[in-house]
Amino acid sequence: MRSIIIASNSSGGGKTTVTLGLMKALVSRGLEVQGFKVGPDYIDTAFHESVTGKLSRNLDLFLMGEDGVKASFARGNGDYGIIEGVMGLYDGRGVTSEYSTAHLSKILKLPIVLVLTPKAQSLTLCAEIEGIVNFDSDINIVGVILNNISEGYYNLLRIAIEEHFKGKIKVFGYLPKNEALSLKSRHLGLVQSVEINTLNEKLEKCSELLENHVKVDELLKYFSKTSDFKDDYHLKNKNLKIAVAKDEAFNFYYKENLELLHELGEVTYFSPLKDKKLPENIDFLYIGGGYPEIFKDALSENKDMLLEIKNKLEDGTRCYAECGGLMYLMEAIEGSSMVGFFKGSSYMGKRLQNFGYAEVTVSKENRLLPLNIKINCHEFHKSYVNTEEETIYSVTKYTYLGENKSWRCGYTKKNVLAAYAHVHFFGNLDFLKHLVR
């Protein structure tokens, strides 16, 4: 599989638009495309899947470790792999480039195309590109695609870039301004792909514009084949019956996490929004993140499911819930009744409560996880819970000021663990083994 990384100088720089347009263009040519996303984001991978028709995979060096990232990449297959970067090219943890798109490009040894959205500049854009290219000589930036500009402005910038770089940086083309390409956002990023009724029309338009204004055949020459990486992330079948909540309200899952659960036994997906009962005779319940606050009324109205889950958990069924899953297990979300396994309620704040990479230390004796086990995680939420339930997590985030910010989380009761932390099992295999033992 030949692959390339689509990066930018900032968030909102056009990476997702170009990535989706390029994926759609290649799929329309009858090619098999594998999508990847740098970092922890769930929403972009869902957009990839809506185009390619196959699983898109996260590549997160902090959550998964270098070997985990290589294993995830090794699971990808197709004619071409397209990796969508995260934030600006060099933006990593704090004020370093650690875990950034640039860092990943060096691990996988893959070339980079920069997507830039210029405004009211000409030669200064060349200075910006030169600074990005020369900032780290160990990465390979092969060219640029300009985004959201007119044809006349593109021709001006193309000449400036070509004359300045003398062919060392290719100008592959541009995407013109077009309102049809915009994707709506909400408090945690883009609106989910499953909620956009006109998504197919948007993708078709994006692909059409990209084919007309970007030299796709020239770009494909720069896709590169990388090493064959090992994938040692497998578990023995324990014949477990596992239920996973999956619908419009709960769909933030890393694909590899689900694949590991499938290796452990039989996985059945159910909808907390629509189903009345859980799958029968389950040993383990997994409720991931999502947007339960958006669907709180519909979740609250499904009384049969709320009672079913509460009774199962009270009877001792093992359960792991992340972020939105934690909110769902509380008594209420913003006044709408929920499962009520944990005492207390969830509320929406006006700002992010905790954002970014953090490290969990299990700091209190409990029946699920060993004391002092450490877990890399990511948090991204505006909600908070008001509860006095027992916590076993001490969560620490290292700030760009060199200080440590710490807080408590990880609510436990009987055989249930619920927390705001999102965890990738590739970086925390022992964590998963303890949860399902």
Curated annotation (Swiss-Prot):
Enzyme class label: ligase
GO MF, one example: cobyrinic acid a,c-diamide synthase activity
Record's keyword terms, sorted: ATP-binding, Cobalamin biosynthesis, Glutamine amidotransferase, Ligase, Magnesium, Nucleotide-binding
This enzyme's EC code(s): 6.3.5.11
InterPro entries assigned to the protein according to its UniProt record, in alphabetical order: CbiA/CobB_synth (IPR004484), Class_I_gatase-like (IPR029062), CobQ/CobB/MinD/ParA_Nub-bd_dom (IPR002586), GATase_3 (IPR011698), P-loop_NTPase (IPR027417)
Annotated site, Increases nucleophilicity of active site Cys, chain positions: H422
Described purpose of this protein according to its UniProt entry: Catalyzes the ATP-dependent amidation of the two carboxylate groups at positions a and c of cobyrinate, using either L-glutamine or ammonia as the nitrogen source.
Free-text note on domains in this protein's UniProt record: Comprises of two domains. The C-terminal domain contains the binding site for glutamine and catalyzes the hydrolysis of this substrate to glutamate and ammonia. The N-terminal domain is anticipated to bind ATP and cobyrinate and catalyzes the ultimate synthesis of the diamide product. The ammonia produced via the glutaminase domain is probably translocated to the adjacent domain via a molecular tunnel, where it reacts with an activated intermediate.
Family, per entry: Belongs to the CobB/CbiA family.
Protein name (record): Cobyrinate a,c-diamide synthase
UniProt source species: Clostridium acetobutylicum (strain ATCC 824 / DSM 792 / JCM 1419 / IAM 19013 / LMG 5710 / NBRC 13948 / NRRL B-527 / VKM B-1787 / 2291 / W)
Upper lineage: Bacteria, Bacillati, Bacillota, Clostridia, Eubacteriales
